[in-house]
Amino acid sequence: MHRVSRALVVASVLAGVALGSPSVHAQAKGAPVNSSFAPVPAPILQGKKAFISFELGDVSSFPSTYSGGPERAYNEFYQGMQQWGRYQLVADPKDADVIFAIRFVDSPGLSHPQIRLGIMDPHGAIALWGFAEEINAAVRKKNRDASFSATITQVVSDVQQLLATGGGPAQP
């Protein structure tokens, strides 16, 4: 009996230490685990003109799961970037300082569909950065559509935050 009590005390102390540790609290609050930042590539920070590329992703989810067509992610991302106004959006990748390639992904191996954004250097087709955001599941189509749009908004916000933390201006 004394052994069981001692084991409970030790377990309680260890649990208290683990729960009281700042890293556990930071993770529980959604704070980033990696607090150090690598430099953001110069074309992203210094670029003035951007081309938005539509990468054809998985089309089987349209129109049954989500409204619109396969180009929905492109259209909503383009609109979000245009409203932000940080980059002048150009129609030809040759005129761009940076390329944003947007794609909807709904592969069988994923637990949730994703919106993926690749940021590339147009001169060397080198990947500079990328984001992947999951689309929250919903039962009703109107809620799935709202979740889709919220995910696109989050991707635009990801780009804004990247520029803000990378030393570049968040606004022109």
Question: Each PLM stretch: what is its role?
Answer:
Residues 1-12:
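Bacterial N-terminal signal peptides that target proteins for export
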Residues 11, 18, 42-44, 81, ...:
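A generic structural signal for short, solvent-exposed coil/turn residues
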Residues 15-25:
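C-terminal segment of classical bacterial N-terminal signal peptides
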Residues 26-50, 77, 122-172:
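C-terminal/domain-edge helix-coil "capping" segments
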Residues 28, 82-88, 93-146:
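Surface-exposed short loop/turn segments
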Residues 28-32, 55-72, 110-111, 147-154:
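Glycine- and small hydrophobic-rich membrane-insertion segments that are intrinsically disordered
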Residues 46-101:
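N-terminal segment of the mature soluble domain
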